[in-house]
Protein backbone atom coordinates (compact mmCIF):
# COMPACT_ATOMS: atom_id res chain seq x y z
CA UNK A 1 0.00 0.00 0.00
CA UNK A 2 2.98 2.30 0.32
CA UNK A 3 3.27 2.30 -3.48
CA UNK A 4 -0.35 3.43 -3.84
CA UNK A 5 0.20 6.06 -1.15
CA UNK A 6 3.19 7.55 -2.96
CA UNK A 7 1.51 7.45 -6.37
CA UNK A 8 -1.62 9.18 -5.05
CA UNK A 9 0.50 11.71 -3.17
CA UNK A 10 2.48 12.48 -6.32
CA UNK A 11 -0.73 12.90 -8.33
CA UNK A 12 -2.15 15.17 -5.62
CA UNK A 13 0.92 17.42 -5.60
CA UNK A 14 1.12 17.65 -9.40
CA UNK A 15 -2.59 18.31 -9.90
CA UNK A 16 -2.66 20.88 -7.09
CA UNK A 17 0.28 22.64 -8.75
CA UNK A 18 -1.71 22.78 -11.99
CA UNK A 19 -4.73 24.12 -10.09
CA UNK A 20 -2.60 27.04 -8.97
CA UNK A 21 -0.94 27.88 -12.30
CA UNK A 22 -4.00 27.59 -14.57
CA UNK A 23 -5.39 30.87 -15.84
CA UNK A 24 -8.71 29.42 -16.92
CA UNK A 25 -11.10 28.55 -14.09
CA UNK A 26 -12.59 25.52 -15.83
CA UNK A 27 -9.15 23.98 -16.40
CA UNK A 28 -8.38 24.63 -12.77
CA UNK A 29 -11.58 22.86 -11.71
CA UNK A 30 -10.67 19.73 -13.66
CA UNK A 31 -7.29 19.57 -11.97
CA UNK A 32 -8.96 20.25 -8.61
CA UNK A 33 -11.21 17.23 -9.09
CA UNK A 34 -8.16 15.07 -9.78
CA UNK A 35 -6.42 16.53 -6.75
CA UNK A 36 -9.35 15.77 -4.46
CA UNK A 37 -9.71 12.23 -5.79
CA UNK A 38 -6.00 11.58 -5.30
CA UNK A 39 -6.20 12.87 -1.73
CA UNK A 40 -9.09 10.45 -1.21
CA UNK A 41 -6.78 7.72 -2.53
CA UNK A 42 -4.21 8.73 0.08
CA UNK A 43 -6.85 8.41 2.80
CA UNK A 44 -7.95 5.02 1.51
CA UNK A 45 -4.37 3.75 1.36
CA UNK A 46 -3.84 4.82 4.97
CA UNK A 47 -6.94 2.92 6.08
CA UNK A 48 -9.02 6.03 6.81
CA UNK A 49 -11.98 4.85 4.76
CA UNK A 50 -14.46 7.28 6.30
CA UNK A 51 -12.24 10.30 5.57
CA UNK A 52 -11.67 9.07 2.02
CA UNK A 53 -15.39 8.61 1.48
CA UNK A 54 -16.12 12.08 2.83
CA UNK A 55 -13.44 13.50 0.54
CA UNK A 56 -15.12 11.97 -2.50
CA UNK A 57 -18.71 12.74 -1.53
CA UNK A 58 -18.37 16.21 -0.02
CA UNK A 59 -15.39 17.77 -1.74
CA UNK A 60 -15.17 16.07 -5.12
CA UNK A 61 -18.95 16.05 -5.41
CA UNK A 62 -20.65 18.95 -3.69
CA UNK A 63 -17.89 21.55 -3.52
CA UNK A 64 -16.99 21.14 -7.19
CA UNK A 65 -20.65 21.62 -8.14
CA UNK A 66 -20.66 24.78 -6.01
CA UNK A 67 -17.55 26.04 -7.82
CA UNK A 68 -19.20 25.38 -11.19
CA UNK A 69 -22.22 27.42 -10.09
CA UNK A 70 -19.95 30.26 -8.96
CA UNK A 71 -18.19 30.28 -12.34
CA UNK A 72 -21.57 30.39 -14.05
CA UNK A 73 -22.76 33.25 -11.82
CA UNK A 74 -19.65 35.35 -12.32
CA UNK A 75 -20.16 35.25 -16.10
CA UNK A 76 -16.50 35.27 -17.03
CA UNK A 77 -17.10 34.06 -20.57
CA UNK A 78 -16.13 37.45 -22.01
CA UNK A 79 -12.74 37.52 -20.32
CA UNK A 80 -11.86 33.88 -21.03
CA UNK A 81 -12.85 31.90 -24.08
CA UNK A 82 -15.35 29.53 -22.46
CA UNK A 83 -16.81 27.90 -25.52
CA UNK A 84 -17.56 24.19 -25.33
CA UNK A 85 -15.67 23.43 -28.55
CA UNK A 86 -12.54 24.86 -26.92
CA UNK A 87 -12.69 22.19 -24.18
CA UNK A 88 -12.94 19.32 -26.63
CA UNK A 89 -9.45 19.89 -27.99
CA UNK A 90 -6.94 17.16 -27.05
CA UNK A 91 -4.52 19.75 -25.67
CA UNK A 92 -6.90 20.38 -22.79
CA UNK A 93 -7.42 16.73 -21.86
CA UNK A 94 -3.83 15.42 -22.05
CA UNK A 95 -2.75 16.48 -18.54
CA UNK A 96 -5.90 15.44 -16.67
CA UNK A 97 -6.06 12.18 -18.62
CA UNK A 98 -2.51 11.23 -17.69
CA UNK A 99 -3.06 12.01 -14.00
CA UNK A 100 -6.39 10.16 -13.99
CA UNK A 101 -4.79 7.15 -15.68
CA UNK A 102 -2.05 7.10 -13.03
CA UNK A 103 -4.70 7.13 -10.29
CA UNK A 104 -6.74 4.44 -12.02
CA UNK A 105 -3.74 2.14 -12.44
CA UNK A 106 -2.67 2.57 -8.82
CA UNK A 107 -6.19 1.86 -7.56
CA UNK A 108 -6.59 -1.25 -9.73
CA UNK A 109 -3.17 -2.42 -8.50
CA UNK A 110 -4.32 -1.92 -4.91
CA UNK A 111 -7.64 -3.69 -5.47
CA UNK A 112 -6.32 -6.76 -7.25
CA UNK A 113 -2.83 -7.29 -5.82
CA UNK A 114 -2.87 -5.78 -2.32
CA UNK A 115 -6.07 -7.19 -0.87
CA UNK A 116 -4.88 -7.87 2.67
CA UNK A 117 -2.10 -5.31 2.98
CA UNK A 118 -2.48 -1.86 4.46
CA UNK A 119 -0.50 0.72 6.35
CA UNK A 120 -1.02 0.21 10.07
CA UNK A 121 -3.59 2.41 11.71
CA UNK A 122 -6.97 2.24 13.39
CA UNK A 123 -10.44 2.56 11.92
CA UNK A 124 -12.18 5.91 12.34
CA UNK A 125 -15.94 5.86 11.97
CA UNK A 126 -18.54 8.61 11.78
CA UNK A 127 -19.28 8.52 15.51
CA UNK A 128 -15.70 9.41 16.43
CA UNK A 129 -15.60 12.18 13.82
CA UNK A 130 -18.92 13.60 15.07
CA UNK A 131 -17.82 13.51 18.70
CA UNK A 132 -14.58 15.32 17.85
CA UNK A 133 -16.17 17.90 15.55
CA UNK A 134 -19.09 18.82 17.75
CA UNK A 135 -17.32 18.32 21.06
CA UNK A 136 -14.23 20.43 21.64
CA UNK A 137 -14.19 21.90 18.12
CA UNK A 138 -17.82 23.05 17.85
CA UNK A 139 -16.80 26.72 17.81
CA UNK A 140 -14.36 26.19 14.94
CA UNK A 141 -16.94 24.22 12.94
CA UNK A 142 -19.54 26.96 13.37
CA UNK A 143 -17.00 29.67 12.58
CA UNK A 144 -15.93 27.95 9.36
CA UNK A 145 -19.56 27.48 8.30
CA UNK A 146 -20.23 31.20 8.83
CA UNK A 147 -17.07 32.03 6.87
CA UNK A 148 -18.16 29.82 3.95
CA UNK A 149 -21.66 31.29 3.99
CA UNK A 150 -20.34 34.86 3.98
CA UNK A 151 -17.97 34.04 1.10
CA UNK A 152 -20.90 32.64 -0.88
CA UNK A 153 -22.97 35.78 -0.22
CA UNK A 154 -20.09 38.05 -1.29
CA UNK A 155 -19.53 36.09 -4.49
CA UNK A 156 -23.23 36.16 -5.25
CA UNK A 157 -23.29 39.93 -4.67
CA UNK A 158 -20.28 40.50 -6.93
CA UNK A 159 -21.65 38.23 -9.63
CA UNK A 160 -25.10 39.80 -9.77
CA UNK A 161 -24.17 43.48 -9.72
CA UNK A 162 -25.64 45.00 -12.86
CA UNK A 163 -24.45 48.61 -12.95
CA UNK A 164 -20.75 48.15 -12.39
CA UNK A 165 -18.21 50.23 -14.25
CA UNK A 166 -15.70 47.76 -15.71
CA UNK A 167 -12.81 50.19 -15.23
CA UNK A 168 -13.69 50.78 -11.59
CA UNK A 169 -11.43 48.99 -9.11
CA UNK A 170 -13.01 47.78 -5.87
UniProtKB/Swiss-Prot annotation:
Catalytic activity line of the entry: a quinone + NADH + 5 H(+)(in) = a quinol + NAD(+) + 4 H(+)(out)
Function as written in the Swiss-Prot or TrEMBL entry: NDH-1 shuttles electrons from NADH, via FMN and iron-sulfur (Fe-S) centers, to quinones in the respiratory chain. Couples the redox reaction to proton translocation (for every two electrons transferred, four hydrogen ions are translocated across the cytoplasmic membrane), and thus conserves the redox energy in a proton gradient.
Transmembrane segments annotated in the record for this chain: 1-21, 30-50, 56-76, 94-114, 138-158
Keywords: Cell membrane, Membrane, NAD, Quinone, Translocase, Transmembrane, Transmembrane helix
Lineage summary: Bacteria, Pseudomonadati, Pseudomonadota, Gammaproteobacteria, Enterobacterales
GO cellular component: plasma membrane
Top-level enzyme category: translocase
InterPro entries in alphabetical order: NADH_UbQ/plastoQ_OxRdtase_su6, Nuo/plastoQ_OxRdtase_6_NuoJ
Membrane-topology annotation of the record: Multi-pass membrane protein
Cross-referenced Gene3D superfamilies: NADH-ubiquinone/plastoquinone oxidoreductase chain 6, subunit NuoJ (1.20.120.1200)
NCBIfam families from the UniProt entry: PRK06638.1-1
Family: Belongs to the complex I subunit 6 family.
Main location group: membrane
The protein's name in its UniProt record: NADH-quinone oxidoreductase subunit J
Summary of subunit composition and partner proteins: Composed of 13 different subunits. Subunits NuoA, H, J, K, L, M, N constitute the membrane sector of the complex.
EC number in record: 7.1.1.-
